[in-house]
C-alpha cells in the first residue's frame, strides 16, 4: 500500500524538538525524510540520557522513520553536497537561529535558484520585529504567546503547561504549512517559503483567551470562578472558561492523580444531583438552572467533590458516563503508558532499536485509512551516509572515505 506522501523527499536540517516533531510527522505520512546532522550529531542524541553511550529517548522519540546523514556544511565540499541535496528535495526544513542558513550561503533566493520547486520551511521563535533575534525555548514561547499568563490559580504565579505547545505545537503548524505549499505547487509548479514562529503557534492555541480579553470590556467573566477581575484575563485554575463549566474533583484514595475532570452541562445537572445524593438541588431555584449555578461554581464543585472523594476515579468515571456526563480521569504518565486502549490504537508503541533494544514512544495521532503508519526506529548517526551519498548522489566509495577522513561527513 502506498503512503500519503510517498515520493516526497524531505531534507531535514532540524534539531531538538520543534523541527524534528514536524519532520517526524511528515515521515509518518510516508515522506522520505533525510535528517542532515553535523558530524557530531543532533545535540539531543546525548541529552537527558537514561542509558550510557546510546541515543537518548529525547532523540529517539522525535526522529522515528527517518534516515540520517552527516555533513559539515561549513566546508566547501560540504556546501557543494548540500547544494545537490537541495536540488533533489521537495521540502527543506530548518529551525536554526535567525539568519544561520543565510550565513551558510543559502539564502532563500539562492535555494529557489537551485530548486524552484522546493518548499522551504523555517521554524523560529518569533516573527519579524523587536523579538526576532531572541532565543526561544518551549516555555519562552508559552510565556510570550499567552499561555503562562492564563495558566495557574488566581492567587499563584504563572505556570507552564506540561504539553509541549511551543515546540511540538509549532511543529504541527509547520506541517500544515508544508502540506499546503506542496498542494499549491501542484497548480503553480513552484515551491515557496513557509515561516512559522513558536510565539505565533502558541498564540493560535490560546485564541479563546483573546476572546475573553475582549469580553472583559463588557464586565466580569461569569464563567470564571474568580472573585476579582481587572483588565487582563486572569488565571482560573482548572476552570474551562467556556460555556460548560468544568473542574477537577478529588477521588479516593487521594493520590496526586486521583482526580476526575467533570463538566456540568444543563442536561446533566439532574442525574448529577442524584448521583451526589442531593436530588433536591435539581428543582431548587438556587441550583436548577445554569444561570443560578454560575455565580456559585466553586460551591457546586465542592458538592460534587464531597461525593467523588469517597470513590476511586475509575468508579466515578463509570457512574458519570452511565448518565452521559462528560468527564475524564486524570491519567498519570505511568497510566498512559500502560493504557490498553492507547496501545490497541497504536498511540503508545514499542519500537525496536539497534542499541537500546527497544523503547516506548508515541504513535501517530493521524489515522489515514489508505496510509497506515508503522513506527520504525530512529536512525543511528550517519547510518545512511553510504546509501545516500553513494547510492543516490553517485559518489564513489573512495570519495566517501576521503570525505570522512577530511571531516566533511
UniProtKB/Swiss-Prot annotation:
A GO molecular function held by the record: formyl-CoA transferase activity
Q: What does it do?
A: Involved in the catabolism of oxalate and in the adapatation to low pH via the induction of the oxalate-dependent acid tolerance response (ATR). Catalyzes the transfer of the CoA moiety from formyl-CoA to oxalate.
| Enzyme Commission number(s) from the entry | 2.8.3.16
- Residues that bind substrate: 242-244
Protein name in the entry: Formyl-CoA:oxalate CoA-transferase
Question: Catalyzes what?
Answer: formyl-CoA + oxalate = oxalyl-CoA + formate
Q: List the disulfide bonds.
A: none
Q: Which InterPro entries match?
A: CoA-transferase_III_domain, CoA-Trfase_fam_III, CoA-Trfase_III_dom3_sf, CoA-Trfase_III_dom_1_sf, Formyl_CoA_transfer
What is the source species? Streptomyces avermitilis (strain ATCC 31267 / DSM 46492 / JCM 5070 / NBRC 14893 / NCIMB 12804 / NRRL 8165 / MA-4680)
Against HAMAP family, the record matches this protein to: Formyl_CoA_transfer (MF_00742)
Per the Swiss-Prot or TrEMBL record, the active site comprises 167
Amino acid at each position: 500500500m502506498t503512503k500519503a506522501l510517498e515520493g516526497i523527499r524531505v531534507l531535514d536540517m532540524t534539531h531538538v524538538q520543534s523541527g524534528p516533531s514536524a519532520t517526524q510527522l511528515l515521515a509518518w505520512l510516508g515522506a522520505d525524510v533525510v535528517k542532515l546532522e553535523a558530524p557530531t550529531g543532533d545535540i539531543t542524541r546525548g541529552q537527558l540520557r537514561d542509558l550510557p553511550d546510546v541515543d537518548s529517548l529525547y532523540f529517539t522519540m522525535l526522529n522515528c522513520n527517518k534516515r540520517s546523514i552527516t555533513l559539515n556544511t561549513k566546508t566547501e565540499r560540504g556546501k557543494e553536497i548540500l547544494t545537490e541535496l537541495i536540488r533533489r528535495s521537495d521540502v527543506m526544513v530548518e529551525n536554526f537561529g535567525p539568519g544561520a542558513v543565510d550565513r551558510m550561503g543559502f539564502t532563500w533566493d539562492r535555494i529557489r535558484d537551485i530548486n524552484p520547486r522546493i518548499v522551504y520551511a523555517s521554524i523560529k521563535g518569533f516573527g519579524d520585529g523587536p523579538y526576532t533575534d531572541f532565543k526561544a525555548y518551549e516555555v519562552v514561547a508559552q510565556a510570550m504567546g499567552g499561555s503562562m499568563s492564563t495558566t495557574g490559580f488566581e492567587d499563584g504565579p504563572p505556570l507552564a503547561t506540561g504539553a509541549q505547545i511551543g515546540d511540538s505545537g509549532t511543529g504541527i503548524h509547520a506541517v500544515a504549512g508544508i502540506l499546503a505549499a506542496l498542494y499549491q505547487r501542484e497548480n503553480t509548479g513552484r515551491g515557496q517559503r513557509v515561516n512559522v514562529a513558536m510565539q505565533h503557534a502558541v498564540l493560535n492555541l490560546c485564541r479563546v483567551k483573546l476572546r475573553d480579553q475582549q469580553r472583559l470590556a463588557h464586565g466580569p467573566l461569569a464563567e470564571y470562578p474568580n472573585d476579582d477581575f481587572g483588565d487582563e484575563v486572569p488565571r482560573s485554575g482548572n476552570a474551562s472558561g467556556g460555556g460548560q463549566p468544568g473542574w477537577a474533583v478529588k477521588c479516593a484514595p487521594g493520590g496526586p492523580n486521583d482526580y476526575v475532570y467533570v463538566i456540568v452541562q444543563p442536561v446533566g445537572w439532574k442525574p448529577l444531583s442524584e448521583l451526589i445524593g442531593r436530588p433536591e438541588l435539581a428543582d431548587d431555584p438556587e441550583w436548577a438552572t445554569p444561570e443560578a449555578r454560575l455565580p456559585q461554581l466553586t460551591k457546586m464543585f465542592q458538592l460534587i467533590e464531597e461525593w467523588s472523594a469517597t470513590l476511586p476515579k475509575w468508579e466515578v468515571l463509570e457512574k458519570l458516563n452511565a448518565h452521559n456526563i462528560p468527564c475524564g480521569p486524570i491519567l498519570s504518565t505511568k497510566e498512559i503508558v500502560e493504557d490498553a486502549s492507547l496501545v490497541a490504537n497504536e498511540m503508545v508503541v514499542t519500537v525496536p532499536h539497534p542499541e537500546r533494544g527497544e523503547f516506548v514512544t508515541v504513535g501517530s495521532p493521524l489515522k489515514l485509512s489508505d496510509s497506515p503508519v508503522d513506527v520504525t526506529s530512529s536512525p543511528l548517526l550517519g547510518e545512511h551516509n553510504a546509501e545516500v551519498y553513494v547510492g543516490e548522489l553517485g559518489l564513489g566509495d573512495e570519495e566517501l572515505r576521503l570525505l570522512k577522513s577530511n571531516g566533511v561527513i
